[in-house]
Amino acid sequence: MTDHAENRCGLEGPRPFSSRHVGSVEDDLRYIAETIGVTSPEQIIRDAIPASVLDSNEGDSSVRTPSFPPAADETTARAELVEIASGNRVTRALIGRGYYGTLTPPVIRRNILENPSWYTAYTPYQPEISQGRLEMLTIYQQLITDLTGLALANSSLLDEATAASEGMLLARRAARKVKSNRFLVHTHLFDQVRDVVLGHAEATGIEVVETDLRDPQSWRPEVEAGCFGVLAPYPDSTGALWNPSEVFDAVHKVGGITIAECDLLSLTLLAPPGELGADVAVGSSQRFGVPMGNGGPHAAYMSVRSGLERQIPGRLVGVSTDADGNPAYRLALQTREQHIRRDKATSNICTAQVLLAVVAAAYAVWHGPTGLTRIARQVTDRAHQLASALRAAGLDVADQQFFDTIRIRTKGGAKELWNRAREGGYTLDLVDGDILQISVDETVTDDELRELTQLLGGSTDEIRGPADRAWPEDLRRTSSFMTHPVFSSYHTETTMMRYLKRLADHDYGLDRGMIPLGSCTMKLNAAAEMEAMTWPAFSQMHPFAPVEDQAGSLRLIRDLEIWLAELTGYDTVSLQPNAGSQGEYTGLAAIRSYHVSRGDTERNVCLVPASAHGTNAASAASAGLRVVVVKSNDDGTIDRDDLAAKIAANEGRIAAIMITYPSTHGVYEDGVRQVCDMVHEAGGQVYIDGANFNALVGWGQFARIGGDVSHLNLHKTFAIPHGGGGPGVGPVAAKAHLAPFLPGHPLNPRNEHPLNDGGTVTHDGHAVSAAPFGSVSVLPISWAYLRLMGLKGLQFATEVAVLNANYIAHRLHDKIPILYTGQNGYVAHECILDLRPLTTETGITVDDVAKRLIDYGFHAPTMSFPVAGTLMVEPTESEDLAELDRFCDAMLAIVEEARMVQSGHWPANDNPLINAPHPAARLVADEWNHPYSRELGCYPGMRLGIQRDQERGLDVNTVTRIQAKYWPPVGRVDNTYGDRHLVCSCPPPEAFED
């Protein structure tokens, strides 16, 4: 065993954190190693990883990380995080610009944000074990459609700026008959939204035209010149309320698509965009109970009119029925998405912001329509009171209708007013030397309103009762919203707590058992890593606060940039991307810009292996690159002959190749360096997808094997939880020559980034996210993970991740073929179980096996990727031997069940697999007309492995096993019915009656 493993239970000092992050104890690790034929976890690394990869570190198989500190214990790491947090100065930030103070109800913070039942689950691809999240996401969609007055909404996008960009791209697809390639945007758009839109437009060849949409003399000639769409903020960045219906009518007449960017809270009082002629509405739901978090994470939304359902990007939850005819939720219209349509998908988005959408939905359920309206009235009343008081004090407050944002005009005196507010602990929006803006939010109290008025030279005597908003009738909301009973049923803490508990019990998270999804790395999210996320120093910081207020966060960001650069071998890192898919787009856009800067404008071909994740092809398309697919060999490796042929056929046009290492086939390819060399010799760049970096951390570096740029997944490799489908963080690491093309930001307080070998570099590309550093409030999780593990701990985690995958492969290979293996017959951190022979022989499909695993108490592995009819299993280092064996026992038992179907013992149309999963309602039904027992159907895992577990001293009490049973709330969901009868809003209560 390695020294790190031997010290796991030592008596000298506290146990290292890595000994609790890794699931198995020392004796079990020794047993696992001996079972697969190695002497230690370290040996599996040396036997499985090709020497060409291990030797990439100048003959030393230990990655050099000179800035990486040794592992800290939890007390020390927490103390350091407290010190870092103390470097932040949290003021009363009334900056606005898309980020607002909000009050997260404690019942939501405690029962969702801080609850592993919610934050450790995966994207709800398996609907039967995701009904709680899917119900909340349906509520979120109902909330959005109600407030925007449109027909259908998705269940979240990454942030407001990317939602606006997705809206532009949707408009381009939907208005394909329009020949014009021009897209109109309002002059008064948030700066960060404009920059992200411009970046996507540049990548896809769209011409963005800025015009004042409040001035017909400005916008009318632009519309008449032709456009395929328009983006109209409502209210706009100056705070002004205006009616965009005239603009929308004109754009419709030329065949374009109209998009409104809306403040969601304001729509409780304002006419919904759907009633004003918008085809699409986008925006952020951040102010629905989600802290600003120095930029994120937050859930953005998009809603569309009827007829655009198949154009909408991202996840869409629909209502279907299960095998017993009961209503059930599931992801709808998945044929739009990247994992199926690849480069033809509506978007490259994969991870979204499920956890934050759930928080926003819960906030709406908690307050209901009456409560939300009260909050909105309070916000706008206080804003109008402040405006009246400041106007009475002689300040030039813009004479415009507004919801929450006051615009003060001066002649060079804006900074003086800003300084006065800062002295009193308030940070306002200094637009320029002449303009100061104040955005009021729900956290502003009457006392603070008076204090701020005095600081700016006004009199509190002028703050009186509710001010006259004087909004015109055509901007006042008259339609009802949030009328579904769910929005009026849970307004006491007892009822809300129990409702959230019931939904959580419907789901399967890591708090219940292993989630062995291949290519997903569902590892432990330790409590010690999670706790800083909700500290006010991180959660209450505004992303556009002055740089001096963010010293702590900037220090943490710098640490992460340096540590990740050292682990990957690259020169620089950007933490801005909010997901792995966004990281892919960022890296590929940097490559495209790099080629253009050198005059190589013809280099627009991205080579993508046939085995690649669908996101790769979709990201290449979103970055303006043409996808050319490279074949794979029978052993899963890249076909270098086909690669050479594709390079030759596209001579002078190769921009990049996208590869994943280890490969998506779950093996370490020996020829990866040769592949990189071939592309470099053709003038292309090498993008290495970091989705599988958990199998390489501490033992190999992407840059050393030929990579020019990679994205990582902090929500996989570096312990940020998946949140049931987001948040994620997808940082991009790159070599120095690509650094200038990584994303900058128009409002970045620090655009200089550290270089791996010292010095700094500026990232000057278009922003890809609304916030300068993306989702800063979850970065302490990865910082804590790295600080607690240290390099040796990370190496140990990699060793055990690979060890566990090979143990599963070893236990199952006699009954279920392992599709691909690498050198010495080993897999990497995941293995592909080939169920195709079983299906051919028994008729039992991969879907049947996945659903039957639910009865055994497991989330299914990844289905039919990268090969149809297979399961890809990734156990991670966090699972212990008992859980690995429980999974293997279940898989072997399922094989035997399939053989009983093959033998005719059970009919093909009535057996435990075809009927899986078995919800509790079937167990207690009066009739049981199946050729197998209720126990076998509903409790199949109760008696597995008893003798072995007894020998290990484990609890084999069947009562205990029964008590631990996970019950799916529904039977198998009918996906086809759900797509043919598309319903994406909350079903009426009577739908759930018997």
From Swiss-Prot:
GO terms for molecular function: glycine binding; glycine dehydrogenase (decarboxylating) activity; pyridoxal phosphate binding. InterPro entries: GcvP, GDC-P_C, GDC-P_N, GDC_P, PyrdxlP-dep_Trfase, PyrdxlP-dep_Trfase_major, PyrdxlP-dep_Trfase_small. PANTHER family: GLYCINE DEHYDROGENASE (DECARBOXYLATING), MITOCHONDRIAL, GLYCINE DEHYDROGENASE, DECARBOXYLATING. SUPFAM superfamilies: PLP-dependent transferases (SSF53383). Belongs to the GcvP family. It holds the Pfam family GDC-P. GO terms for cellular component: cytosol; glycine cleavage complex. The gene is gcvP. Residues 1-20 are annotated as: Disordered. It comes from Cutibacterium acnes (strain DSM 16379 / KPA171202) (Propionibacterium acnes). The lineage of its organism: Bacteria, Bacillati, Actinomycetota, Actinomycetes, Propionibacteriales. The modification N6-(pyridoxal phosphate)lysine is found at residue 716. Its cofactor is pyridoxal 5'-phosphate. The glycine cleavage system catalyzes the degradation of glycine. The P protein binds the alpha-amino group of glycine through its pyridoxal phosphate cofactor; CO(2) is released and the remaining methylamine moiety is then transferred to the lipoamide cofactor of the H protein. The glycine cleavage system is composed of four proteins: P, T, L and H. Keywords: Oxidoreductase, Pyridoxal phosphate. One of its GO terms (biological process) is glycine decarboxylation via glycine cleavage system. It catalyses: N(6)-[(R)-lipoyl]-L-lysyl-[glycine-cleavage complex H protein] + glycine + H(+) = N(6)-[(R)-S(8)-aminomethyldihydrolipoyl]-L-lysyl-[glycine-cleavage complex H protein] + CO2. Its EC number is 1.4.4.2. This is Glycine dehydrogenase (decarboxylating).
